[in-house]
Amino acid sequence: MLRSLVQNPRVRARVLERVDEFRLNNLSNEEVWFRELTLCLLTANSSFISAYQALNCLGDKIYYANEEVIRSILKSCKYRFYNLKAKYIIMAREKVYGKLKEEITPLADSDQQLAREKLLNIKGIGMKEASHFLRNVGYFDLAIIDRHLIDFMRRIGAIGETNVKHLSKSRYISLESVLKSIALNLNISVGILDLFIWYKETNTIVK
């Protein structure tokens, strides 16, 4: 089932095009990296579409606007968690903007799990968000475990009932190892497998 999707020329071409975009992000500047981090902050507990729309509403204000302005923009865009996420964006900017790429690149180049651990120090970034960020800046060895991947693994019998909203770190790593085994069997990276599963579950490649 999944193997045929991975081997489908049309779907594979679309997925690999997205992968190339992530690889280009890896070569991009600090502004691009912080924008991707902001997207991941906004995606937590929200849909990707809602987060992406909110990010576009914010534009370059993520780099300089104060918390009140960011909160107001998020609210006007009908983004649900405008108070909390405005606070997180400001905290992240004060903590890592200007040195994000410099600090994460050497870590991720040598050990992506260590890079993920470093990102967990940013308020609002959990295992999924850190993995999502690293994938979006060109690192593909970590799984982005959301409800779509949980549903998929449950349907194929790889896991039992799992509450995606209350994943402990150890449970996340356990589920990630299941996905890595599936990816290894298909001869692709787990971060790329995610895109195929996302396509199968949503018929889109926007993640």
From Swiss-Prot:
InterPro entries: DNA_glyclase/AP_lyase_Ogg, DNA_glycosylase, HhH-GPD_domain, HhH_base_excis_C. The keyword Signal does not apply. Keywords: DNA damage, DNA repair, Glycosidase, Hydrolase, Lyase, Multifunctional enzyme. Pfam families: Ogg-HhH. Its EC number is 3.2.2.-, 4.2.99.18. The active site is at residues 128, 146. GO terms for biological process: base-excision repair. The record marks 207 as: Important for guanine/8-oxoguanine distinction. It catalyses: 2'-deoxyribonucleotide-(2'-deoxyribose 5'-phosphate)-2'-deoxyribonucleotide-DNA = a 3'-end 2'-deoxyribonucleotide-(2,3-dehydro-2,3-deoxyribose 5'-phosphate)-DNA + a 5'-end 5'-phospho-2'-deoxyribonucleoside-DNA + H(+). One of its GO terms (molecular function) is class I DNA-(apurinic or apyrimidinic site) endonuclease activity. Belongs to the type-2 OGG1 family. Catalyzes the excision of an oxidatively damaged form of guanine (7,8-dihydro-8-oxoguanine = 8-oxoG) from DNA. Also cleaves the DNA backbone at apurinic/apyrimidinic sites (AP sites). This is 8-oxoguanine DNA glycosylase/AP lyase. It comes from Saccharolobus islandicus (strain L.S.2.15 / Lassen #1). The lineage of its organism: Archaea, Thermoproteota, Thermoprotei, Sulfolobales, Sulfolobaceae.
